Regions:
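Beta-strand-centric surfaces of beta-sandwich/beta-rich domains
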Residues: 1-271
Length: 271
């Protein structure tokens, strides 16, 4: 009889063992709004081969203050970029019971450092970042990618302007005219734009593919923000299993429970 070592799914994170108002790791934005701060270690070394990463952002939004921001997920001793420019501005305070959560089906080998860096309109200001890793000795139960391409960033820390419709779908907005790679998974990121006096709203954000007038919706996400300029995702924002060919046009649109307003968005394609 052969003996097979047990296979199991494992998790690892930088979450605090004891309740705290500053969960995870403080990652500080750069000295100018378009400059990333220094890389900050989030996890010293992965305990196992990682198949999926959840990132949770909080504590960067502030009432009456513009808080556009973006974040790079870095790996290895050289701080190589695994995911660039995840839009994460206006993330709510921990005491407001909200956060922004994104999931990426990406591979990180065992024994590798995980870090992050950020840029934001609120310069030299910390945001809290939690990373939850999934993997282990099992074969991955989902398709896993090795790299991620970000589309739609205009000038850091902002993505492409998306105008939300008032209780109706806004027009499709082009995020990129042509993808550089084929992608099997897309993740949207989305934030307010230079807001200092917004009202509370719920938002439905759609993303899709196709030429002008022939767009096909591939997925959707739900956000909500308060009148204190704090924006949350409602649940984990993974993306959608898709088959997007290289050279595809990616688009985004949004609808709001209030008046039409400007937001900005990006789409992250996993390969």
């Amino acid at each position: 009889m052969f003996w097979y070592p047990p296979q199991r799914l494992r998790t690892q994170s930088n979450a605090a063992a004891i309740a705290t108002l500053t969960p995870g790791t403080a990652v500080t934005t750069g000295a100018t709004s378009s400059t990333k701060g220094s890389p900050t270690q989030i996890i010293a070394a992965t305990d196992f081969d990682v198949w999926g990463v959840t990132l949770v952002f909080s504590d960067y939004g502030a009432g009456g203050v513009a808080s556009d921001a973006c974040f790079d997920l870095l790996i290895g001793t050289n701080d190589d970029v695994l995911v660039a420019n995840i839009l994460c501005g206006y993330s709510p305070l921990t005491t407001n019971l909200g956060s922004q959560r994104y999931w990426f089906p990406l591979f990180i080998p065992a024994g590798v450092k995980v870090s992050g860096r950020a840029a934001g309109v609120r310069t030299s200001t910390a945001m809290q970042v939690q990373a939850f890793l999934e993997g282990g000795t099992i074969s991955p139960p989902w398709r896993v990618g090795s790299r991620c391409t970000t589309y739609g960033i205009t000038t850091v820390p902002d993505g492409t302007t998306v105008v939300a419709g008032n209780a109706s779908e806004g027009a499709w907005t082009e995020i990129t005219a042509s993808t550089t790679d084929a992608h099997f998974y897309l993740v949207p990121s989305f934030q307010l734009t230079n807001e200092t006096g917004v009202q509370g709203r719920s938002l439905a954000v759609d993303y899709g593919v196709g030429g002008s007038g022939s767009e096909i919706q591939l997925g959707s996400a739900v956000y909500a923000h308060t009148n204190q300029e704090q924006l949350s995702t409602l649940g984990d924002l993974g993306g959608e299993d898709v088959a997007v060919a290289a050279g595809s046009r990616l688009v985004m649109r949004a609808s709001s429970t209030g008046v039409s307003e400007d937001y900005n968005g990006a789409i992250h394609g996993v390969t």
